[in-house]
Regions:
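C-terminal membrane-associated helical module and adjoining short loops/tails
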Residues: 1-7, 17, 27, 35-43, ...
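Hydrophobic alpha-helical transmembrane segments of integral membrane proteins
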Residues: 2-3, 11-15, 64-67
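Residue-level signal for threonine
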Residues: 10, 60, 123
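Core segments of transmembrane alpha-helices
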Residues: 12-19, 70-79, 106-107, 129-141
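Residue-level signature of the transmembrane alpha-helical core
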Residues: 14, 37-40, 69, 97-100, ...
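Active-site His/Glu-centered metal-binding helix of metallohydrolases
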Residues: 15, 44-52, 69, 73, ...
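Membrane-embedded alpha-helical segments that form the functional core of polytopic membrane enzymes
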Residues: 16-65, 78-98, 156-171
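Membrane-water interface of transmembrane alpha-helices
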Residues: 104-112
């Protein structure tokens, strides 16, 4: 049973997504709060599933496959919803596009490399990028309530969320470039062996 807990958490993160979308569209404070809580739970399980798998030595191929997919689904869904409702707008949309584009490119690269049995390990900077993305999205989801709780003169929850979104977009570019470079190097070295 212990071996299954990390995968159950990962699958649970995917199952949360439709409920998150539903809560996002519920009107009023309780809809916003429910969407925020679901996003935070999903974000926390991202940390928890990997930690438990490593701690108990129960890492699995299924977890290796599903974990990055679950991350991308929740982050992409949240970013799209925040753009659609105007929370992320104007030039800020560029940061969301950078994040989404990188996720698609790296997913394709990982799939391509997996065919050659080449693993592309997650870097510490990529982990930091994910944390920044999730914190920025949580702040943006917190809405007016978050702005009342976090309000330092010119910086409220929304402003800090946008700043962190841009920081995560910058890290996204850097880590995306690093992964692409390593992936292309692997692919070219494999071609040279043939």
């Amino acid at each position: 049973m212990l071996k299954k807990i990390p995968n159950i958490l990962t699958i649970g993160r995917i199952i949360i997504v439709p409920f998150f979308v539903l809560a996002f569209y519920l009107p009023g404070f309780y809809g916003d709060l429910t969407a925020l809580i679901l996003f935070i739970v999903a974000s926390f399980t991202d940390f928890l599933d990997g930690m438990l798998a490593r701690m108990f030595g129960v890492e699995s191929k299924l977890g290796e496959l599903l974990d990055p997919i679950a991350d991308k689904i929740i982050v992409a869904t949240a970013l799209i919803l925040l753009v659609m409702d105007g929370t992320i707008r104007n030039y800020e949309v560029i940061a969301a596009i950078i994040i989404l584009t990188r996720e698609i490119l790296i997913s394709g690269l990982r799939e391509f490399l997996a065919k050659g049995k080449i693993k592309l390990p997650v870097s510490n900077l990529a982990k930091l990028k994910t944390v920044l993305q999730m914190v920025s999205i949580a702040l943006l989801l917190s809405g007016d309530t978050g702005n009342k709780i976090i309000d330092f003169e010119d910086y409220n929850a929304q402003t800090i969320g946008i700043i962190l979104l841009w920081l995560s977009a910058a890290l996204t570019l850097f880590t995306g470039y690093d992964y692409m470079r390593k992936g292309i190097d692997h692919a070219m070295s494999e071609d040279n062996k043939d």
